[in-house]
């Protein structure tokens, strides 16, 4: 099996999407029958034509201009990269892959994102992208967290700062276990 530089291919893929905004360069990093699935919204596609259409009209040029991806961790295997990051942006445009059909709210959003990228013959074959959609909806004002075990921006901040308090959503239960034998 050839030793492909997965990190270089992955970094070029991300650069093509988020910096160069170049659909053709993005597609050049992928195998012809690649699959992309933004899991919470089931957006993406399978195969060259469907993915090129998705990237051209619903992804590459539709990010808010202030989007920032903050790396948290990366695990590299023989044919897989798992990237953990925090995405920060202001919801100033329709973002089809993240909030399909939701008009801009002007609100700030910070969300942890995990991407599982699989490679085949030195090119990207599959991306599964995960984030907490409830947190996004709370942050843009479309979901009231009252009485629900969900949080807004706090989840991203906790990923970036492990010293922030844990167990806030189960405060009563946490307090009830205080002083018990461990």
Put a short name on every predicted segment:
Residues 1-182:
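C-terminal and inter-domain tail/linker signature
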């Amino acid at each position: 099996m050839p030793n492909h530089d997965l990190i270089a291919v992955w970094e070029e893929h991300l650069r093509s999407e988020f910096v160069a905004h170049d659909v053709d360069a993005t597609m050049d990093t992928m195998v012809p029958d690649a699959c992309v699935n933004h899991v919470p919204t089931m957006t993406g596609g399978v195969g060259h034509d469907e993915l090129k259409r998705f990237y051209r009209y619903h992804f590459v040029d539709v990010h808010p201009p202030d989007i920032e991806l903050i790396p948290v961790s990366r695990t590299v295997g023989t044919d897989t990269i798992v990237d953990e990051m925090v995405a920060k942006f202001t919801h100033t445009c329709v973002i089809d892959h993240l909030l399909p059909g939701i008009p801009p709210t002007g609100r700030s959003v910070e969300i942890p994102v995990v991407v599982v990228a699989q490679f085949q013959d030195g090119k990207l074959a599959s991306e599964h992208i995960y984030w907490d959609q409830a947190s996004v909806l709370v942050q843009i004002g479309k979901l009231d967290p009252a009485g629900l075990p969900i949080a807004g921006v706090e989840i991203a901040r906790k990923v970036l700062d492990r010293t922030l308090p844990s167990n806030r959503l189960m405060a009563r239960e946490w307090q009830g276990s205080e002083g018990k034998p461990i």
